[in-house]
């Protein structure tokens, strides 16, 4: 289930209405971090994968270091965290000390319009996870999903 970027209280309502939750991915944005922080923190305890961009990660965790930010978000409840770093790719954090992955973005000569690239990225991840039929994808599965998401966002 992909809880696309909307108010965290709405994401929680959608989650509560679904009886069969196989794998839950949530996306957010800076406005919800500022205006519905408590609801967002509650949501993070109920998701398998939390996806956030670089500036949002810094805002949520009140740190400028993305490694520290990723680790702090992992302590808030999700099984995995992805920090999107735009043209620089993404970072994946897992529960184990050795569960960290950094990938670059798919290289392009020119970008016409990056609008919606983050949504395409998350959609590519969700699509890959759904295609392998795993309720609990492995860390390697998530790494593969990021590769697909990166191509989708390009």
What do these predicted ranges mean?
Residues 1-5:
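Short N-terminal targeting/anchoring amphipathic segment
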């Amino acid at each position: 289930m992909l809880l696309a970027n909307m108010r965290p209280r709405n994401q929680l309502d959608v989650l509560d209405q679904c009886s069969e939750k196989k794998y839950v991915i949530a996306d957010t944005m800076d406005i919800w971090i500022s205006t519905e922080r408590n609801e967002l923190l509650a949501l993070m305890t109920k998701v398998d994968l939390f996806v956030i961009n670089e500036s949002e990660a810094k805002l949520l965790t009140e740190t400028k270091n993305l490694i520290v930010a990723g680790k702090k978000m992992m302590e808030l409840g999700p099984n995995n965290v992805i920090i999107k770093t735009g043209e620089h790719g993404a970072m994946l954090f897992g529960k184990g000390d050795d569960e960290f992955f950094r990938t670059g973005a798919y290289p392009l000569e020119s970008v016409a319009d990056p609008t919606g690239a983050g949504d395409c990225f998350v959609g590519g991840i969700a699509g890959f996870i759904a295609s392998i039929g795993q309720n609990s994808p492995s860390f390697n599965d998530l790494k593969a999903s990021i590769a697909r998401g990166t191509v989708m966002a390009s």
